[in-house]
Amino acid sequence: MNNLKIYLSGSVRNVNGDFQSWRTQCHFIQENGYYQNLKFVDPIEFFNYTNKLPQSEKQCLDLFMWQIEQCDVVLVNLDYSNISVGTGQEIEHAFCKNIPIIGFGEKKETWYNWSAERCSVIFKTLDIAIEYLNDSYAQV
């Protein structure tokens, strides 16, 4: 069984730090081997808009789009996608490259409708989405 590379997409700017706890949870899952065949690619490990800044927006855009193309699937936190242009671009890029998009979120009133429409399936929680990825995509 090969590793399933999963790109983590979701709002970074204009949301508080607590909102990023879902990314921390993904790292915890990977580091502790809970799902040994899942590998998370988190773009904010490279540029996080606070202390890790790109030299240009093009540099950031090119890297993130390239990372998406190297992944098997995109996992998107849809909460606050209505204020995140970058999340929308990541989702659209994955869609155009025929990369499956799996969504999750609990605050539907903060979702950008077009982002949600691009998802193959949407779950309420991160845990359920990860279990689905492991049981479905990682077993191929």
Question: Where in the sequence are the language-model features?
Answer:
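Conserved catalytic or regulatory cores that recognize and/or transform ribose-phosphate-containing ligands
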Residues: 1-140
